[in-house]
From Swiss-Prot:
Protein's name in the database: Mediator of RNA polymerase II transcription subunit 19
Gene that encodes the chain: med19
Region (Disordered): 1-68, 178-249
Pfam families, per database record: Med19 (PF10278)
Disulfide bonds: none
Length: 249
């Protein structure tokens, strides 16, 4: 037994890795005590398996590729849309086969020219701008060469700025003339009062007649004269007023 225990004791420390630290007694399965070193090990707990990302498909085309969300962490981003044949440079009339409708409604020749509707517009507006290089496209592609010096305008260009001499039209003659304002010296009536009814010619004649009769009355004239005499006596300018005052003193 001692031989077997010695064999087991010799084989056990060899399997344990050596680590720095104080020696300790390790019990064996046979009950023999051998000198060895302690071993510290932390148990590892297995966690949940990580999700496997979906495989990227190499073939993506059309609307499915534009609507399918991108795989991976950049899920907000979307793939670029495919190239479209319909751009701003495409002629929509030819694209939608509307040549017949365009020629039907827009290709009719009018009997009257454009100058009949715009007589005051200078220049030859009946001819297209491509003939005399006055169109907007020709001005953009081939801008006119201008020097540093100013050249006077031609007679055709001056017609747009020229004022035609002649009398003013009737509707514009009295625009700058303001009518004279009547001065109203009468007292303004209050807004609460009702407006007086208009006077008839018979009422005005009756008032004038009554006023004339009052002026022709002899007693009325005599009373007026007496009032004037009394006023003149009491006034300081009257010559008799000073003598009467001195006599009283």
């Amino acid at each position: 037994m001692e031989g077997f225990s010695g064999l087991f004791a010799a084989s056990e420390p060899s399997s344990i890795p050596s680590a720095p630290g104080p020696p300790s007694v390790v019990p064996t399965c046979t009950g023999a005590f051998v000198s060895g070193k302690t071993q510290t090990s932390t148990p590892t707990v297995p966690g949940p398996p990580l999700p496997i990302p979906p495989p990227l498909s190499s073939s993506s085309s059309g609307e499915d590729s534009s609507r399918r969300p991108a795989a991976g962490p950049f899920y907000i981003l979307r793939e670029l849309p495919g190239l479209s044949d319909l751009t701003g440079s495409v002629n929509l009339i030819l694209h939608y086969n509307l040549e017949h409708s365009f020629s039907k409604f827009c290709g009719k020749k009018m009997k009257e020219k454009l100058s009949n509707f715009l007589p005051d517009l200078p220049g030859m507006i009946d001819t297209p701008g491509a003939q005399d290089n006055s169109s907007l496209r020709s001005l953009i592609e081939k801008p006119p060469i201008c020097g540093n010096s100013f050249t006077p305008l031609t007679g055709a260009l001056l017609t747009g700025f020229r004022l035609h001499t002649g009398p003013l039209p009737e509707q514009c003659r009295l625009m700058h003339i303001q009518p004279p304002k009547k001065k109203n010296k009468k007292h303004k009536q209050s807004r609460t009062q009702e407006p007086a009814p208009p006077e008839t010619p018979s009422d005005s004649d009756h008032r004038k007649k009554k006023k004339k009769q009052r002026e022709d009355d002899p007693e009325r004239r005599r009373k007026k004269k007496d009032k004037k005499k009394k006023k003149s006596r009491h006034s300081p300018e009257h010559p008799g007023a000073g003598s009467s005052q001195s006599g009283l003193r």
